[in-house]
């Protein structure tokens, strides 16, 4: 596959492309590779949002299908109609807490759904099938030592490490990985597998720890922490995993696994403290700005100093609520990602920059996930018994003008300034529920 952007001409199917990672990736590919066609398949479950796809819904090289990967007839229709070259398989249930309560659904969606997709793919001449797995398939990054003190030692997992999943979610992803590998061996399907650290950023559904903490604080509620909060995770900002997929699309070798990781590691408790700090700092800045506008005298400087001193000795306990731990909670996920780095990838967004951008996005978009009725939206067209958004031959000039007018102001694209105020994004309007 040629590295030059203008020669990158492919038809790329992204399953789960209206979700968090998938939507950022779909927007990036649609805008960067104008000669390619980006097709998104998503059933618009609770953690997906058609608005995530923002300004690309009417791009000439984009199309959206609403449907389930468990629907083999739908998959066959899409592959036959679109002549898919590359599949990036992101569709999955991913929330660990839910997997303890609804494990059968995770098996059905993550394993059986992947199997249906593989069965369809084997009948077509794909160039790449990228299965998006998780670092959690490795299990906890601690192994027990055999000395008399029962010490544990840290272990970094590379792509050849044994899979040792410890919860129903990670087990379902590991099981699907084995299916993917079997289709590579048995049917020569050109597969690549990725395993990434935790991803965060704008548009993530607020069941995950970072948006959950942010939204709780924005609503004057406490951060809820499992157990002691000493479990650690490694965090990558969304733009960095998108750039990793760009590299893997162009340079990844068939039959290989690539870890996508970062050396930045932080405990759940310290994540909460960091977000609390940002929240208080932003509030203090707003208050100080108001004070300066109302009273321009030397006392304001003293007040500012007092606020900072109070902040430094702040008691975090009033912002945190400790709850029962998960049935099993991996201590850490430390992965070696040198293999991907050797292809030329490196992260570009620091934790400090990424977490501030993320907080500001949620602060400016507090109602983004509220009152979403995924079954009642406008401008859906029927074609061969399945539904899709995207550019149609009958799009009128007014729609194109609307798209051009709003395209530059889309608040859900990851590559724009996040300090955009309260402007509404361009999207196909959702009908409000009665």
Swiss-Prot record:
**Annotated stretches, region: Disordered:** 286-310
Provide the catalytic activity annotation: dTDP-alpha-D-glucose = dTDP-4-dehydro-6-deoxy-alpha-D-glucose + H2O
InterPro entries, sorted: dTDP_Gluc_deHydtase, NAD(P)-bd_dom, NAD(P)-bd_dom_sf
Its Enzyme Commission number(s) read 4.2.1.46
Family annotation (SUPFAM superfamilies): NAD(P)-binding Rossmann-fold domains
| Gene name, Swiss-Prot/TrEMBL | tgds
| Amino acid composition bias (Low complexity), ranges on this chain | 286-309
Q: Which UniProt keywords apply?
A: Lyase, NAD
Q: Where is the active site?
A: 135 (proton donor), 136 (proton acceptor), 169 (proton acceptor)
Amino-acid positions noted as binding substrate in the UniProt annotation, renumbered to this chain: 134
Q: Which GO MF terms are attached to this record?
A: dTDP-glucose 4,6-dehydratase activity
Q: Which PANTHER family match?
A: DTDP-D-GLUCOSE 4,6-DEHYDRATASE-RELATED
Q: What organism does the record attribute this protein to?
A: Dictyostelium discoideum
Which co-factors does it depend on?
NAD(+)
Per the record, the similarity remark reads: Belongs to the NAD(P)-dependent epimerase/dehydratase family. dTDP-glucose dehydratase subfamily.
Record's protein name? dTDP-D-glucose 4,6-dehydratase
What are its GO biological-process terms? nucleotide-sugar metabolic process
